[in-house]
């Protein structure tokens, strides 16, 4: 166990020195495994196995990752966010704080076909912020609603983070997608309540916009048919077992391409999306390979088993163990980027949680699905908390005159409702597990 702790410390040091995480995890995992096993051939064999896993043709299931990345990039380029925001604004804009609520709803809808928090936040900033500024919204509320709404991109399926978690823990991606839908919907409602609370305290923060006549509202709904159709096709097919998650990813990417062509997106733009998606997927696969090598080292060094024995020997209540794990995630989220945090910690914590399944009163089949959802929610919180808060910095890059301190000041009520949601999902696993049990019981 000592070797694993030393390796973990070395890995954190390499990350702080800005060594690319894929190489840092791969190097620490390789040399750590060599040290633990005392055999260079064994270390080379393990690294080779991890590499082969990602390139062998029979592992076509891994294509789910680049396909969902491609779908999200095509949807973002096709401009669906504008129609989503227009429809939500038509129904909510006339209320106090209504444009911020419309932003949250539009973020939820965009997340359902995008799968990336950063892309959701960046795209919605270009669409929603000019409108809210035009009606006199305070920047604290306007930008906070975009940054918080953007976090829904990794929880409402399809989600790239969920795919990575599923690959690392060998869990069903379709069950993870089913488990994320209800918590994501709850997140939309709670963020809207956070907006209501903000404008209740300060009515000038979110003035009313003009009321949109019903004919215009219904006309605006016609603009979101593409999102609804793609969402129903991909997730409906997965949930009702019409096709596998891998097939759904391919169908979703084809559907997004067709929709982009119908929107008259030029071939040059489509080529740029393909290149961007290929680069992103290559980076993710290298990171995943490094994470798998590091995971092998952590397991060989006995860190999860050692921690589990330490916890069991102290008679620590299982939910207190989970609470400590979540606290560690919150602390790490303040200094680490979200993907790095998940890749670093999941290999350590998921065997512990799996071992605690009987004490938690959960079926071993479902415990890691539940754990995956609460990990994603913690990751959402890390995306909007200082000092790292990637969604906040994405907003600052999209809106040059925006100060990050302005966004962080407005984030407090959204972080509070996120913590409430996290507590509810942790103490009531049935919230996350109801849909996957219903569909795949």
Task: Give, region by region, the residue ranges found by the protein language model.
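Alpha-helical transmembrane segments of multi-pass membrane transport proteins
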Residues: 1-441
């Amino acid at each position: 166990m000592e070797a694993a702790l030393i390796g973990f410390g070395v890995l954190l040091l390499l990350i702080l020195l800005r060594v690319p995480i894929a190489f840092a995890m791969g190097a620490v995992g390789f040399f750590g495994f060599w040290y633990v096993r005392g055999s260079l051939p064994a270390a080379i064999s393990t690294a080779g196995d991890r590499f082969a896993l990602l390139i062998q043709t029979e592992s076509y299931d891994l294509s789910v990752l680049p396909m969902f990345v491609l779908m999200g990039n095509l949807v973002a380029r096709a401009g669906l966010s504008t129609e989503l925001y227009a429809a939500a604004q038509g129904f909510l804009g006339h209320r106090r704080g209504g444009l911020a609520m419309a932003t949250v709803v539009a973020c939820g809808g965009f997340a359902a076909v995008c799968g990336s928090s950063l892309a959701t936040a960046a795209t919605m900033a270009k669409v929603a912020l000019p409108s809210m500024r035009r009606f006199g919204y305070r920047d604290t509320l306007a930008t906070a609603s975009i940054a918080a709404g953007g976090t829904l991109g990794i929880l409402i399926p399809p989600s790239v983070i969920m795919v990575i978690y599923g690959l690392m823990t060998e869990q069903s991606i379709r069950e993870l997608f089913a488990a994320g839908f209800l918590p994501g919907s709850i997140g939309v409602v709670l963020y809207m309540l956070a907006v209501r609370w903000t404008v209740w305290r300060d009515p000038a923060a979110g003035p009313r916009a003009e009321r949109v006549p019903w004919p215009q509202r219904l006309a605006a709904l016609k603009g979101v048919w593409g999102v609804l159709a793609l969402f129903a096709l991909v997730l409906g097919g997965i949930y009702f077992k019409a096709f596998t998650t891998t097939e759904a990813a391919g169908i979703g990417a084809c559907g997004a391409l067709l929709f982009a062509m119908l929107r008259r997106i030029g071939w040059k733009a489509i080529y740029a999306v393909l290149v961007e998606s290929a680069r992103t997927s290559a980076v993710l696969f290298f990171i995943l390979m490094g994470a798998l090598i590091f995971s092998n080292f952590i397991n060989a060094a006995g860190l999860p088993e050692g921690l589990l024995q330490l916890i069991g020997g102290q008679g620590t209540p299982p939910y207190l163990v989970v609470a400590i794990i979540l606290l560690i995630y919150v602390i790490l989220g303040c200094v680490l980027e979200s993907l790095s945090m998940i890749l670093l910690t999941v290999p350590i914590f998921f065997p512990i949680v799996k071992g605690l399944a009987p004490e938690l009163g959960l079926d071993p089949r479902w415990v890691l699905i539940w754990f995956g959802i609460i990990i994603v929610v913690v990751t959402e919180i890390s995306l909007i908390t200082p000092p790292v808060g990637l969604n906040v910095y994405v907003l600052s890059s999209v809106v040059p005159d925006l100060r990050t301190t302005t966004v962080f000041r407005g984030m407090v009520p959204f972080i509070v409702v996120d913590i409430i949601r996290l507590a509810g999902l942790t103490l009531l696993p049935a919230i996350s597990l109801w849909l996957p049990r219903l569909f795949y019981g």
